[in-house]
Amino acid sequence: MIQTESRLQVADNTGASEVLCIKVLGGSKRRYASIGDVIKVSVKSAAPRGRVKKGDIYNAVVVRTAKGVRRPDGSLIKFDANAAVLLNAKLEPIGTRIFGPVTRELRTEKFMKIVSLAPEVI
């Protein structure tokens, strides 16, 4: 469950290591984002020679949350930390690699590229 001012780890190789959620996209009254939701983020810390730099604003998709996601069979998938993958304006991933597991909830037409790059799909 991600809201404005939430800090997330970055699960790709763009060079960013931490981002801050500045807006949950999808309606003016929308407060929380979960796995598979698109948010607007600001880069808070980045590697010196990465693709992105500190202060840049990007779209991102949430790939892991500590709150978890409930499956129809009743199981709950939780992670140790919140993580996101940075996206460009066309909602395509900026990075070429994804680190760590992602959930099956990302298997929509929009994010199949992220699922195919991920080392593990839970």
Swiss-Prot record:
GO CC entries: cytosolic large ribosomal subunit
Source superkingdom: Bacteria
Alphabetized UniProt keyword annotations: Ribonucleoprotein, Ribosomal protein, RNA-binding, rRNA-binding
Gene3D superfamilies: Ribosomal protein L14
Any GO BP annotation: translation
PROSITE patterns: RIBOSOMAL_L14 (PS00049)
Organism: Polynucleobacter asymbioticus (strain DSM 18221 / CIP 109841 / QLW-P1DMWA-1)
Pfam families hit by this protein: Ribosomal_L14
One function term, GO molecular function aspect: large ribosomal subunit rRNA binding
Family of the protein in this entry: Belongs to the universal ribosomal protein uL14 family.
Keyword check for Cell membrane: no
Entry coiled-coil feature ranges: none
Protein's name according to its UniProt entry: Large ribosomal subunit protein uL14
Entry function: Binds to 23S rRNA. Forms part of two intersubunit bridges in the 70S ribosome.
Subunit structure: Part of the 50S ribosomal subunit. Forms a cluster with proteins L3 and L19. In the 70S ribosome, L14 and L19 interact and together make contacts with the 16S rRNA in bridges B5 and B8.
CDD domains given in the database record: Ribosomal_uL14
SUPFAM superfamilies attached to this UniProt entry: Ribosomal protein L14
HAMAP family: Ribosomal_uL14
